[in-house]
Swiss-Prot record:
GO terms for molecular function: ubiquitin protein ligase activity; zinc ion binding. This is E3 ubiquitin-protein ligase UBR1. It is an enzyme of class 2 (transferase). Residues 1901-1945 are annotated as: Disordered. It comes from Kluyveromyces lactis (strain ATCC 8585 / CBS 2359 / DSM 70799 / NBRC 1267 / NRRL Y-1140 / WM37) (Yeast). Ubiquitin ligase protein which is a component of the N-end rule pathway. Recognizes and binds to proteins bearing specific N-terminal residues that are destabilizing according to the N-end rule, leading to their ubiquitination and subsequent degradation. GO terms for cellular component: cytoplasm; ubiquitin ligase complex. Its EC number is 2.3.2.27.
Amino acid sequence: MINDTDPESFLRQHVGRTLGCIHSRPEFKDIKGSAERAVMDKELKSFIYGYYYYMISDSGRLLPHMFTATNEREFPKNVDQAMEIKLSSKPWYKIDENGGHSKFNHAGRICGAKFRVGEPIYRCKECSFDDTCVLCVNCFNPKDHVGHHVYTSICTEFNNGICDCGDKEAWNHELNCKGAEDNGRLEDEFDDHDGKISKMLESVLIELFDHFIDVFNQNIEPLTTIQKPLIAKLRYFIQNGKYNEQADMLRRLAYRNQYMDEEESQQQTPSTSLDPLSTLKDYAILVYNDEFHNYSQASAAIRQGGPDNKHIDLLTAKIDSEGRSLLRCSADIASLMGGFFSVQSNGLSCTITQWYEYLHQEACKYSIMWINDCLNIPNSTFQSLFRNAIGKVLCSKYEPFYQSIDMTSVVRDYFSDSYLSDDPYLYADHSVLGEGVKIPLGRHKSLDPGDISAISPILNKVIAEDHHEYTNSRLQYVLFLENRYWKKLRKIVQDLIIPTLASSAVHKPMFTDQLVEIFPHMTRSVTFMDREPQLTSLRESVVQLFTCPTTAYSIFHSGHFNYVIWSVIDVFVDFSTMDEGTLVWQRVQRSNPSKSYSISFKQGLYAVETLLSKITDPNLLLKPGEFIMIVTLCKLFNGAWKIKRKEGEHVLREDQHFIPYLEYTTSVYSIIQTFDKVLQQSKDHIDQRLLIGAINLLDSFLGHRNLSYKLYKDFEIIKFQISKERVSFMNPVHTLFSFLVQHVPLQVSIQVLSQSKDYLVISDFALRSVVLCSQIDIGFWVRNGMSVLHQSAYYKNNPEMSSYSRDIQLNQLAFLIEKNDFQRVIYNMLDRWELLDWFDGSVPSTETVYDDKISSIIQQFVAFLYQILVERDFYKKFDTLEETQLYNIKNAIIYKLYAEPLSYTDLLNDIPDYLTESVSQFDTVLEEVSTYIEPKGLEDNGVFKLKKELYKRIDSLRLLNMGNDFEHSATIVKSHLADSKEKRAKIIVKPQLLELDELDPCARELGSFTRTNLFAKLIFKLLKLAVSDSSFSFTYELLHLIHAIFRDDEMVNGKDSLPEAYISKPICDLLLSIVDSESGSFSENVVATADYLLDNMIMKRPTAVLESLTECFGTKYIADYKIRKANQGVNFEETEQERKRRLAKNRQQQIMNRFSRQQKKFMDKHEEYSAGNDEDVDMDGEDLAGELNEFHCSLCHDDVSDDFFVIPIYQNYSPVFLSSNPTPMEIYKPWHGFDNNEHLATYNTDLFYKKKENGASQLMHESTQKVLVSCNHAVHYRCFKHYIDKKRYSTDLFICPLCQTYCNSVIPVDTVKLQSGDRLLQQKLTGGLDESLLLTFSEYSSECNDEVGKIILSLKDSNNGLRLNRNDPTWIQDRFLTLSLQFSNNICMLEMLSRLNKDPFGTLLSGEEQKFKTLQNILKSLAVYTRLTKHTEENVLKFYEDIRSSNLPSYPFFRVVETVLRSRLSFKDCLQEVLVERLKGLTKDFGSFYRKYESELRAQTCLDSSEFSIVLKTTILGAGFGDQVEKHTLDLFYTFLISELLPTLRRSIILLKALKQFMTGGDDLDFNEKDVLSGSLTSESKEKHFHLLIRFLLQTDFYDLLMNSHSPLSPESSLVNAPHEYCSIIKLTDLATHLNTYVTNNKNITLREENDQKIRNTVNRLDYKICLICGVKIHARTDGLEMQKHMERCSHGSSGLFLIPNISQVCLYLSRPDCTVNISAPYLNSHGESGRNAIERGDLTVLNHARYEHLTRLWISNGIPGYISRVMGDEFRVAMANNRTFTRNMFWRPGAAFNAGGESSDEDLMNDDEFGNDDRPDLRFRQPDVELRINGGPFGGDIPIRLPTERGDIHDFFEFVQNMRGGMQGDGADIPTTEDIIEQLQGNAMNGFFGRADRNREHFELNDQSDGNEDGEDEEHENNASEDQDTEYSSAEEGFDFNELNNVE
């Protein structure tokens, strides 16, 4: 096929012609209906793919190497075969995805792989340049990151990117790619030695992209700039009958190419029609997606357009997902115009497009998709060649064989106004290519070199380019035309271009240069001309390109930074206005439904910030041109958002206009922070001339304001009143100015700024922000609503912006610069705080503008003055940047930890991000200043506590503590510094001022203004005001300020110095007034501080101060004061020597006092030895026979006995009863308690992974393996019925009224103790009884009448999920029989739990009190049923026969329980009978076991059987062994028997304890003077434990037991063939030691897969769960039902646990009601944190065995449902309501408490407070699996259960459901109560039973109404609810058939 003379030219012509003539192929030529279009779509894709692949295969030679999974016979032999369309067969070009993973390699290039949904995105804190550098699953090599902080995220549609592996700039050191490690370099057919393959690829790609550009160059109709005028033109032509003009315009808009022209010239025939539109054939209506309409609006518009597809929803869904869809097509264009205008009139974007053009656009789409498919071919050589070819073709100039049609004439003729004809930006503003099909001229600007000496308040002069030479590359064309593509096409174009070019070292610089060239075009396109601006490629391009330092430098050095920043500035300037002489941005007030303005604003600011952040040379940014451009952008937001205080009425609707200002100004602050960071990191390389020049530029700009002044005394101060005028919070340029000043010596700053016109003009704006925040904080702006309060808090407390602290620094500079004019600065400051009139006495404090808030504003004012004086970190000298960072980190940690210990995550969240960038620095400082406290329980996290000695460094009035109350903070500090209250009262919290030698020399004068007479006067007036009214809240802060002033004076002028101004003003008099004030007038802190300051003043200047005090208070008063102080140890006149002597004497007295206290404590402790106790001891401690047990109703809290008690229970199938073939690991593994074997962390064999069977066998399986769980909260039956009725619960679905535990049934309990319990038990243990225990129970159980008995017998068992039929066993519904079986199962479960203990033998009977109490309650219930039930022997025998045939693994022990309770035999005989039969069966089983594992058993370690060798040799003959048996075989047999029999023996001991507790109430088991607790259970090994139990229980030894087993087998024996029960430790699946293993080394963890065939790429996906029961990996499904599906497949019961590795959580799942709770996984990091917090920073997380054991115990004991109900609280009630009420649809909550990300932290494992959040708020509906009506109505009908109205967060939801059901069922029905129905059917027979005293009923009702867990308004709700029901209402008992009452005997 290839022409050898010029193959490239021939190939290009062939591809060009094929693409250009694709419309003429028979398969695609004619228009088609909706069904035909669907087929054509597949045909077009098949044609495109097959043709392209063949054209790049060198005539098919390379196809077998590209598609290795395809048989060579299926490949086409020539191009014609390649172009054949065969939809019926599998395409031959299918890429083998699974095979590709093993062959992945990107040797010699950057990986650049696009992340696919579900795949992990890896980041390494230590290795990466920044957070944008990521690795894919194929490249990530765990060996490179051992000990590093590796953290992952999951790729989603909105969180994606490309792999940076191989990019040297992305990583701090070279990485070893996993793909390169696994694959060697192999020679293949793609080695391109002669360049032939490259040229072939380039030729195909050139024509592909040229055709693509040609098609979309002519496709201008979708442009937003064209659509409106186009519609207007069409309407004008049609309305005025100008059909020729209409046809001409449509013809010029249609797509044309040279091949079409050739075809028309050959087929042209003269038209005879008079209708000009008849020449326009085959048109279609295309509807495009936009961001203006919702789903329903789009559907309505489409319906009006008359689509040819009746499935409107499918069309709408396609438009939403793909971005466009074809509505209908027709050969007659006139028939389409009505539909076209109908869709347009509804606002949807649509075009009327020729069929050929639509076909070519679709071909272009598949062409791009084909390129993306090629990028997945698993051949590294091909990938290198293909990617290089793509880069070369895209970055080269667009020079097609045939020039595309120039559309500029169409734009000029139809879509532009005449006055715009000379506009140079006409085509750019219409987003069309310019003349000659070139990139049109854009807005490229640069600063005028002659205007860089100052920053204009408006805009500096710029030079706009009138001509620009663009590269005109294919890349620029494809990006420029982007806003014409629809959603799907845009996405695949971006997936092609950005990863491919950004990952190429050769083409990445070209990509950058060409993108920056058209950056102005793309920015304006996104802003004004994009239908879907959120899909722009600009954002992703910026992320991939501008984050590269080399790229950033090239942009600056090439001068192209102008293009970027001026395009951003231009967009903002378009929305700016003049305000007080400056140009500032204002909120957009134009209609913008696409939100393109917001997207463009954010994108532009992000681009600038990203570029600046990658610059390391600060001089690039300080150059006048670049600096002015950056400031020009920032100054648009300097004071942009101004607010004015409102007066009068409160606002009805708060102003939310501040949000965009806040959002964009915050981004500007980020740019400034980035700018400062660049200066900090390269401080030694800063050109000081450039820096000073930048300061001068800002000084002149900020000082240019012409402000109004007013004359106060002799000083000109600025005239401004914050409470009356418009004022702004944020001034980012002032913040930048503060940063710059800090980078030069303070002396230089003062010299430069002293030349300012008036520095107060600059500092005053910062002062306004401070005052504004203070006024808002005190509630002075309350009329403006809450929004201003949020703004103020955001401004002050956002350390990332540093704005508030910078305002403080600018005001500090005012005192340093204006040091010769302090009075003016102070007066200006007082005026700005609006306190000047009060200060000069013009108005009293009560008549200022603040009225009653004067105290609060002065408190803020004093804090401001203190910060001006004390905040000196700005001037602290540091040698290195690291020293600066460590200092700031240390201060931040100290001030966050002093109030309370914090977890690591909470601490990080409270500290600015820029201080936590270096993890090592942060951790080093944290270790230095804090003490780590490990988590002590199962639910808490590790916390860090501040070291005690550091509390002395805390200053509660500093900026670091600004968010906390000063006095409260001081109290906390004092409480940590002193242990007793007396000591705390003496402690004075001192101001913390940096020493002068740590500061810049000029900073020593910062406090000079505080020593002036004017300032001393201010302090005096403030203190006088505080003394005049002790209720003022600023006194403590004011005293702290005075303390700081004295401390600063000491530092400057010496230790004994005291400012003269503070002596001349009688401040000391006021201090004494505070000290001697009445008790309670001032707080202890205030009095102590005042006393300290007064002492300090007297000590320094005793004469002057005492004279002032005497003059004020009188001589006698001061004399008394001196005496009082002397008594306190303060003598103002004593010498230094006298003071030392006095202190020594005091210390001696303290020592003697301490000794006396210790002596008294010793005597008190040993008082018993010195005094006798003659009190009598009450020896009568025994219980009376027949005494009632103490039962109290949980609802009415009464203990009356005329109503029987029931216990709420939860009973359900448990999967822990494992039946399986024995294995050596199970039999011979010793018990050492709960453990975890990382090497087994694959899957838990086949123990738990069992497919659920249907039918009778599954019913029997689940019915016989139920366990019963209870909270053991008793309740009267009548109270219970009333509770169920009122709450509208069902008896098989309710929660305990006391503890909110999920229950599904109740059991009645007897309240009478047995008489002579000890004697009976002793007899049963050894000698037997005259009758069975059950009959003995019945004799002592309480009497009840027949009616009560019938009620008790009607209580049914819970059969959740079981559908009974007439063939099912009757005993399943017999509560007595099922309870006896569940009693046995509960004991088995309790024994399994004890195996998890560290000492499984000694702790068998210790702990688990609740579970033993449950066993007692079951026995009490059996006692009740024994009296009432008269089972026929036939039913009982059938019951036991069914149990025997059900393969119940614990059947042997059930036989023990059954014979002990029902037979007259002794306990010993019952047990021995079972053990003997089991020995026979086990002997037989050992034979098959040995033969199966013979080779493995030869090396097995086991117990020594020497003591029993003789009898074992005889016994083993039954296993098929001969007489000569090896010693090792006997040892194996001996160990086998012990392992198999031990569980039954242990359970028998538990049975004994349960009987002992039930019959006697005691816990100790001492039979025949043998103490079980200290005897049989105290053993170190399984063997010793076994023999001790044998001796105790059977009063014999193992030898005799073996001998007894030699007797002949009884024909009735059923235990010989009993199923084998798993006898090792039962637990959840083994897990990896480190959770990170699942995340970072996923491929090395072999897990059983349970993936859905519809889920793709399962090998690399990380969004999976692990079933902790069976260890199966379950991949996420789109419908969120993966857990439910797994539970349906596996026999796990109704609840499950699923580990979610990627978020470190465990999902607890409950199937009925369907709900989930997410808790932290049992993994902890080094900081003691769990859950998301443990892994979000990449910390190594280790499995915590205690927490995992706790989860295991929760699972074994069937406690997950109860735990879920308690955690969910009200949400569980909603889940129950959904499960019972909705008969067709139900709210489906797949993750009721899922916590992924949000931003709240995971505090504790199983923290009930944290599980109410829902990260998946969307509610979906689905069909319920079961009928949601309960049977048991009074006349055979169903009971419709209505929802109760509940309080709490879901109150409104309950009301909604109630109203909905009321509307469905009607109103006015009278609902009878359960009591009414019973009385109606049974007469008054029940009156005696329910006849409790009135006081009890009243007590119950009152208590029920006040119960915190119940409704306080139940009466009201119940009355209201009764009106919404019109059907019969019966007893709440499910399955309660009243007709059966008369049949009960």
